[in-house]
């Protein structure tokens, strides 16, 4: 018996020992792996604003009033801008066109057909002033809405932001060219199909070999909540971020991480509102849900600036998404910070 059992014990001991070694190695590697993921995905440059918000400056107060005026015109006077209310889609495009022309821009429309109707993307361009004028910084926002929703936050707030950024830069050429583009057909049933306005635009840009060095999708930037528990996230982002919805979010896919870092560093250097950023795989829910996705498909670096919409806003895609729900003071702080981002991105390298 003894001579039989000893070899069995000798065979078992090494296996047990190596199993323990493997477990110890795994236990040491996992924290390192989580640290690397945190450094690559969650850690952002600069210091986010914290504490009590300072009073708006006179310029920010004027910006606040203008933002509210645009949102009330689009989501109040015009209202729902979906396939079911096609005349309102046309009216919204005309409103955007009129504002841009009043700022001195030449407006270009990119028309396309979808579901037997004509839709258009509306574009204004601020030509660059240096040798890098062929390089483009593009600011985009969709002006349509979901059905049965007036779309104050989603996305009259984003349209208002881009219109006011166009005002800021109207007489201030940068080294790189800056484009302000307003997309049709971001919402269902168009998302995510070839009939999205941004898909038409991004594919045409690639066909022309446009050198878009940065695309910023301004998507739902008007709603904030300082109550604990007001903010949710998709997994695994819920493991790394706070549950108070008082911040503006900036997200990208992994390929656009360098642009994300540059943008959020510039934003934090100026803005008086908290920020959080994430460079996450495109499969994470919410990360790709807007027009920046169209530019990713064409190989362009693109990020989304958002209040996180359905992960915070209780009136998302409902008839209650009305102008009275938004915080125009905080929205003005966001747009003011974005102006600083654009200046940094559009300067000569």
Give, region by region, the residue ranges found by the protein language model.
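A non-catalytic alpha/beta surface segment that caps or lines the substrate-entry region
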Residues: 27, 58, 69-129, 276-278
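Active-site-adjacent substrate-binding region
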Residues: 225-349
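N-terminal Sec-pathway targeting helices
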Residues: 11-33
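Extracytoplasmic/secreted proteins, especially bacterial periplasmic and envelope-associated proteins
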Residues: 66-69, 73, 87, 91-102, ...
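Proline/glycine-enriched tight loop/beta-turn segments at coil->beta junctions
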Residues: 129-136
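Acidic/histidine-rich catalytic neighborhood of metal-dependent amide-processing enzymes
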Residues: 146-255, 284-287
